[in-house]
Amino acid sequence: FTLKKGEKIAFIGESGSGKSTLVDMLMGLLPPNSGEILVDGRNLSAQNLKNFRQKIGYIPQQIYLFNDTIAKNIAFGEEFDEKMLARVIKQANLQSFITSLKDGANTLVGDGGGNLSVGQKQRIAIARALYLSPQILVLDEATSALDNESEAKIMSEIYKISSDKTLIIIAHRLNTIEQCDKIYRVEKGKI
């Protein structure tokens, strides 16, 4: 299949069908067993892999947070820009939660995010992926732990901010992918 810049696509299928493996190949994390992955007409290789990966914002289903502040987890340990931080906090629907905290975005999350709910961790991961303004945004069942209302708000915001981005979504809820240009079913490792 071909994925064009700015296109929104989704992969659906049963657990174990190969959706995540396919996306790992598209991100250059796994080499394909056969065939090739072309980026702008060039084979994805060791020479261009690092540059390609820098264009990707990835939101996994299983989130890892380190024992530091919300802000530093979003900026992934880098020095952070307050305006950019505020922007992604809003985009990830975190502002009311952060406002309710005594220390705001400077609140410690605890080891592995132990002080947070699964939904709060997912929203922090979404903010992290958006922080560096990636050209390609990959959501691997990234909203699965959210309630329907939170998921709808976040997906609406993701579609809005990804109007000029390529969006790749693995989802189990069809309402998550209703705005995609193409939807691919993955079965037994085949599209």
Model-derived regions, located:
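ABC-type nucleotide-binding domain
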Residues: 1-191
